[in-house]
């Protein structure tokens, strides 16, 4: 969902699964970042305050309409219908608020406007309302963009080598175990990452997004971590007061369950962008920024592509040019695809099927036996 028009690109012809899973090239590409930038129309790099705010206003208006209908009319429904109405509200509100999350993420990339302070204020407010420590995540996410697909320095969804996987992993490599793992990942994955750095880069000591003195941050970033914590605490206190006034069940139904859906979509989207049998990871002997940025996948979420402001199907372009606003990313993707060629990876597999397949196929990474490129690692599932 979004305000104003947006260029749409017809989806590419549907590939056979064997083509989708075919490994992308891992050698140094025959093009440069500068050549890719020249192929993109200059206006795609322009950020408009009014246009960016129009998406904020649109999303928040839709979210308010859903909230108003739920809180003013659902109690009038016969009980069987209310059992249907609330799950519909949770799903719709969760999707819309995921779009709000994406806009706040864009603020963290300085892609919302030409004014860094404005971007940070908008991002802080929106992310805090979704219980996200804005600056804390902004800084760790920036390092993810600087080190994508590096086994040593990437910040999140860092795959394990075969020698590092836990002993119980092979016992979870079956349908019931996979369902259990995915359920935990989608429901608890985001808060566990923020609080305990689960699935994040290993540090030499405890790492937490709420700790200003943790190893994730530098001395000059610590004040902003305090600000992020204050934002989350302020919203948490507001929710406490709401629960005291309206009841805990009201807060859970109106806010809590949609937030769980936001968190689940966030984990799913980022997991599928960086986890695929066709894309490589690199150790320090092979990694470079451009190849790392290209080790990402554009996905198709159907109508949700629009609701999520195309973060799902323009992620390759986003990793190459992260300060580009989302409303130009489709046009930019269309412009660079002919240059990227086989280095561009798109997978139109429905996201629910892709999530199951990747959980099955992408257990750990290892280098190919006999390959001269010992620093290039591919996903594997064989124990």
Curated annotation (Swiss-Prot):
Catalysis: reaction(s): (9Z)-octadecenoyl-CoA + 2 Fe(II)-[cytochrome b5] + O2 + 2 H(+) = (9Z,12Z)-octadecadienoyl-CoA + 2 Fe(III)-[cytochrome b5] + 2 H2O; (9Z)-hexadecenoyl-CoA + 2 Fe(II)-[cytochrome b5] + O2 + 2 H(+) = (9Z,12Z)-hexadecadienoyl-CoA + 2 Fe(III)-[cytochrome b5] + 2 H2O
InterPro entries named among the record's database cross-references: FA_desaturase_dom, FAS_N, Fatty_acid_desaturase
Motif (Histidine box-2): 141-145
Positions occupied by motif Histidine box-3: 315-319
Subcellular compartments: Endoplasmic reticulum membrane
Pathway as given in its UniProt record: Lipid metabolism; polyunsaturated fatty acid biosynthesis
Catalytic activity, EC: 1.14.19.6
Motif range (Histidine box-1): 105-109
Transmembrane domains' residue ranges: 56-76, 84-104, 117-137, 179-199, 225-245, 249-269
A Gene Ontology term for the protein's cellular component: endoplasmic reticulum membrane
One annotated GO biological process: unsaturated fatty acid biosynthetic process
Keyword DNA damage among record annotations: no
Function: Catalyzes the desaturation of oleic acid (18:1(9Z)) to linoleic acid (18:2(9Z,12Z)).
Family: Belongs to the fatty acid desaturase type 1 family.
Entry remark concerning the domains of this protein: The histidine box domains may contain the active site and/or be involved in metal ion binding.
Protein name per UniProt: Delta(12)-fatty-acid desaturase FAD2
Organism name: Vernicia fordii (Tung)
């Amino acid at each position: 969902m979004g305000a104003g028009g947006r260029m749409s690109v017809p989806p590419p012809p549907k590939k056979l699964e064997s083509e989708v899973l075919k490994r992308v090239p891992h050698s140094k590409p025959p093009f440069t970042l500068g050549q890719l930038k020249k192929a993109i129309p200059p206006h795609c790099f322009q950020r408009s305050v009014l246009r960016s705010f129009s998406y904020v206003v649109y999303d928040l208006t839709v979210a308010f309409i859903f909230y108003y209908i739920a809180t003013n009319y659902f109690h009038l429904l016969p009980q069987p219908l209310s059992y249907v109405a609330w799950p519909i509200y949770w799903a719709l509100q969760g999707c819309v608020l995921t779009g709000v999350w994406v806009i706040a993420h864009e603020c963290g990339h300085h892609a919302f406007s030409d004014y860094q302070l404005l971007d940070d204020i908008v991002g802080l407010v929106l992310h805090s309302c979704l219980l996200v420590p804005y600056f804390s995540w902004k800084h760790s996410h920036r390092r993810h963009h600087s080190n994508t697909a590096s086994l040593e320095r990437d910040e999140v969804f860092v795959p394990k080598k075969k020698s590092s996987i836990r002993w119980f992993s092979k016992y979870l490599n079956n349908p019931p175990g996979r369902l259990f793992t995915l359920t935990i990942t989608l429901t608890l994955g985001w808060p566990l990452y923020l609080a305990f750095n689960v699935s994040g880069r290993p540090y030499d000591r405890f790492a937490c997004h709420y700790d200003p003195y943790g190893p994730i941050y530098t001395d000059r970033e610590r004040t902003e971590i305090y600000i992020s914590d204050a934002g989350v605490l302020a919203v948490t206190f507001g929710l406490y007061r709401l629960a005291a006034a309206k009841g805990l069940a009201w807060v859970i139904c109106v806010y809590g369950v949609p937030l769980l859906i936001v968190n689940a979509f966030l984990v799913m989207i980022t997991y599928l962008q960086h986890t695929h049998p066709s894309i490589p990871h690199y150790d320090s002997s092979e990694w470079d920024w451009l190849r790392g940025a290209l080790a990402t996948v554009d996905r198709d979420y159907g109508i949700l592509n629009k609701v999520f402001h195309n973060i799902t199907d323009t992620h390759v372009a986003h990793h190459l040019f992260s300060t580009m606003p989302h409303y130009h990313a489709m046009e930019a993707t269309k412009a660079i695809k002919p240059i990227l060629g086989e280095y561009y990876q798109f997978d139109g597999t429905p996201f629910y099927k892709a999530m199951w397949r990747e959980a099955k196929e992408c257990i750990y990474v290892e280098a190919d036996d006999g390959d001269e490129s010992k620093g290039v690692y591919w996903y594997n599932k064989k124990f």
